[in-house]
């Protein structure tokens, strides 16, 4: 359904809102009801080139701004974000569909990264060692790279961009942001508040679009580094194409996160934790719990409680505080998820909770879905479904649970529920995952730690946030000096 007040999105280049040089646009839809709420331009390479030139020009002066002054501007930006928390959450729920509770959580996690970026004077400090030889001192200095870019996904339209441009800009770089064409409204709001904070024009530039914009970023010689978050095939493409063009690239990709449930866990808290991790944000997050590997001794009790509690969850428009599961992002994704559920049934998994027909009249909804007796041969175990679909695999012991999780091509996050320090230590040492939780439902690190997975969940060397983020957005100069 097309609404009469649908917003026309614009690019933001060199401090001004400008139309794309391309003629095409894409509908932005509220996934809770299918209404068109905006039109995002499908920009062309010439738009990217304009943005890069603006950023390149701004870099000449921005890189010379004292680091404390950059941090002060970011603090003003932080204050504006804090003042508009509720409005930002409302935009997220409107264009992404996640519940207001989840949207508020996303807003807070994004703000925490800006808080980190305000500490740049400390984070960018170099190293020094006097008297490395007779009368000679050595030191390491950090400098910005130049123009850098970020390509961000639909599922966290606030948090993921804030993983990127605040820290990059704090380090003295200028930035070109390409948000998902499915969730462009929040990106526009982030840019609006950025310039309201007083930043010079051209420091942050916004270009909407699809693959043409992505390729324009990856192949532009003036862009020195690219940050990406999205699906595994696209992450691999971004990494290979970007590095082939001489860029530094971090590409965060897909996931199939496992939670191992031990017999000595706190059963009630474990069940509630897995429900939140599996079905929160409609399962559309790279840190969602996709598989519960449950030790046989507790499996029946676990399933009984899990099924009972999951059936209490309500599905619907994220604006209702009663709803736990919101819509999926688009109809095409909903159909893909339904195909996976059909596949699980055909391959012999036991459908314990069927979310295919929630009592919702419009929108792209699939309710919380649980499969029991899943095996590694099944597609629902192998593939990232990106939906509120949980697979339960029964294992004999911790060793089998770890072996199961490590078979996955993905290695983003993993969790163990246990009261045994020995089991937790074994899990920590043997599991192949970039981010690990012990009785922590979603082991997404705080902003001062790095965020990245292993194997097909991450392409690159340096993750986002924390010290990794500063290293990614800076280059080092090692200075050896002697004075006569």
UniProtKB/Swiss-Prot annotation:
The UniProt entry's sequence similarity note says: Belongs to the aldehyde dehydrogenase family. IolA subfamily.
Q: Which organism is it from?
A: Bacillus licheniformis (strain ATCC 14580 / DSM 13 / JCM 2505 / CCUG 7422 / NBRC 12200 / NCIMB 9375 / NCTC 10341 / NRRL NRS-1264 / Gibson 46)
User: Which HAMAP family does this UniProt record tie to the protein?
Assistant: IolA (MF_01670)
Superkingdom field:
Bacteria
**Coiled-coil residue windows:** none
| PROSITE patterns reported for this sequence | ALDEHYDE_DEHYDR_CYS
This protein's record includes keyword Chaperone:
no
- GO molecular function terms attached to this record: malonate-semialdehyde dehydrogenase (acetylating) activity; methylmalonate-semialdehyde dehydrogenase (acylating, NAD) activity
Enzyme class, broadest EC rank: oxidoreductase
CDD domains attached to this UniProt entry: ALDH_F6_MMSDH (cd07085)
Q: Any idea which residues are catalytic in this one?
A: 286
> Which proteins does it associate with, and in what oligomeric form?
Homotetramer.
What's the name of the protein? Malonate-semialdehyde dehydrogenase 1
Q: Which Pfam families match?
A: Aldedh
* Protein's pathway: Polyol metabolism; myo-inositol degradation into acetyl-CoA; acetyl-CoA from myo-inositol: step 7/7
**Its job:** Catalyzes the oxidation of malonate semialdehyde (MSA) and methylmalonate semialdehyde (MMSA) into acetyl-CoA and propanoyl-CoA, respectively. Is involved in a myo-inositol catabolic pathway. Bicarbonate, and not CO2, is the end-product of the enzymatic reaction.
**A GO biological process this protein is involved in?**
thymine catabolic process
SUPFAM superfamilies named among the record's database cross-references: ALDH-like
- What catalytic activity is recorded? 3-oxopropanoate + NAD(+) + CoA + H2O = hydrogencarbonate + acetyl-CoA + NADH + H(+); 2-methyl-3-oxopropanoate + NAD(+) + CoA + H2O = propanoyl-CoA + hydrogencarbonate + NADH + H(+)
Keyword Transmembrane helix attached: no
Residues noted as binding NAD(+) in the record, renumbered to the chain:
154, 178, 181-182, 231, 384
Q: Which UniProt keywords apply?
A: NAD, Oxidoreductase
Report the EC code(s) recorded for this entry: 1.2.1.27
